Amino acid sequence: MVRSYYPSECHADYFDFERIEALKPAIEACGISTLSQSPMLGFHKQMDNRIKLLEEILSFRMQGVEFDNGDMYVDGHKAASDVRDEFVSVTEKLMDELAQCYNVLPQLDINNTIDHRPEGDEKWFLENEKTVTQFCRKLAAERPLKDIRDEYNYPKKKGIKDECSRLLEASTMKSRRGFAIQRLMNAMRQAHADGWFIVFDTLTLADDRLEAFYDNPNALRDYFRDIGRMVLAAEGRKANDSHADCYQYFCVPEYGTANGRLHFHAVHFMRTLPTGSVDPNFGRRVRNRRQLNSLQNTWPYGYSMPIAVRYTQDAFSRSGWLWPVDAKGEPLKATSYMAVGFYVAKYVNKKSDMDLAAKGLGAKEWNNSLKTKLSLLPKKLFRIRMSRNFGMKMLTMTNLSTECLIQLTKLGYDATPFNQILKQNAKREMRLRLGKVTVADVLAAQPVTTNLLKFMRASIKMIGVSNLQSFIASMTQKLTLSDISDESKNYLDKAGITTACLRIKSKWTAGGK
């Protein structure tokens, strides 16, 4: 009906099959979701999904509905005039939305490259005050598919909860947690290499500030933005400058195991310490202080405890800060600079916290004196927060072959503890290289996708529940160092991210949190 603008069997003569076959490995490794970040392909996918949903809703609404001489009949029964009028009004609006999407299609030339930003022809500009690119972006932002479902009362069907869905959900959550931890550990590694200051902080919520915190949906964003501006000020830069190059953060929510009290663990990475940051042990006979006074009063919703992360040859030591001692006056035990990363990572992996987070506030577990107040507050799910592109920095891949990039998307954890970061960076590099491929070629070369949940449910009948997890794992075998090319091995060695290399580095660097 409207899918004719996509390649199909009737277009087969227009495609160079050798070229399409050559593209398939890179497109499969990169993935359509990554490639859809390119403007032209992204807009095609956006419009396709929007049209499919609107057509589906229209078809659903018209089931059993007939019109005769201005009267409406539903399953043979005549509808009241007010019901008919409302139905017609809503249906007309639905069809207007469809027509709007149909008007965009002629502006999306599938023979153009996927990185092209469509502007529109003369007719488009006569009818619209913005380019096709601006129109599509505004439509996606102001009219998401969820809003369409809500307005037309067409919710998504709830999935069946069974052993397969639970296994898949657990596997997805495990992968997400693993990716977050990899980004944290890579950021620690990079901060050490670049000589940045690392500060660990715990943010609590005071009883009298709970309501203010929950009333402000941007409380955490504003806090980290303020810290970023403090770093900018210390570098003599404007407050409205981007602080991405001088400040980053990683924040994990935790619900206390005793009574479910919400607090946050944050790691700040700063190229320059905020103005007024001085060694808390300067002039003291017992050097047992670790907190940064310059950051102590920046959290407006409770108590914070910003502590300098110390290790041999850290940025604090190079700035002349004294090495702190413990309560007994003994120098702090030296451990790897990665220790703080592992310390924060345990909160990412803490399953009891994930269970409480799924309930929202964990209000029932919070102490009894606050139960009434909490019942008046909106339920809210707090997730791990981090700076944009946090921990994603890797050695450039611009000179690597496509074959090498494909291998980097398939590496296992045994080859490098940063395999998921490598995968995303390799996919991004491939997306840039595929930018000059046409939309038609990408759509023709895209692999046939398998519904993993349906496949698992079909497989369970043959292999049984007990063997399902290992069977699924065997389907996604990862490459080891012995499986990859010399080019890929050389890249890992040069980047210093092989498991062996990272073990050596952890021995080189002493320190403690």
Curated annotation (Swiss-Prot):
E.C. number(s) listed in UniProt: 3.1.21.-, 6.5.1.1
Source domain of life: Viruses
Start and end residues, zinc fingers (unnamed): 246-268
Reaction catalysed by this enzyme: ATP + (deoxyribonucleotide)n-3'-hydroxyl + 5'-phospho-(deoxyribonucleotide)m = (deoxyribonucleotide)n+m + AMP + diphosphate
One Pfam family recorded for the sequence: Phage_GPA
Transmembrane segments: none
Catalytic residue positions: Y343 (o-(5'-phospho-dna)-tyrosine intermediate), Y347 (o-(5'-phospho-dna)-tyrosine intermediate)
Gene Ontology biological process: DNA replication; rolling circle single-stranded viral DNA replication
InterPro entries, A to Z: Replication_gene_A-like (IPR008766)
Key words of the record: ATP-binding, DNA replication, DNA-binding, Endonuclease, Hydrolase, Ligase, Metal-binding, Nuclease, Nucleotide-binding, Viral DNA replication, Zinc, Zinc-finger
Example GO molecular function: DNA binding
UniProt family annotation: Belongs to the microviridae Rep protein family.
Function: Plays an essential role in viral DNA replication. Binds the origin of replication and cleaves the dsDNA replicative form I (RFI) and becomes covalently bound to it via phosphotyrosine bond, generating the dsDNA replicative form II (RFII). In turn, viral DNA replication initiates in the presence of host Rep and DNA polymerase III at the 3'-OH of the cleavage site. After one round of rolling circle synthesis, protein A is linked to the newly synthesized ssDNA and joins the ends of the displaced strand to generate a circular single-stranded molecule ready to be packed into a virion.
Protein name, UniProt field: Replication-associated protein A
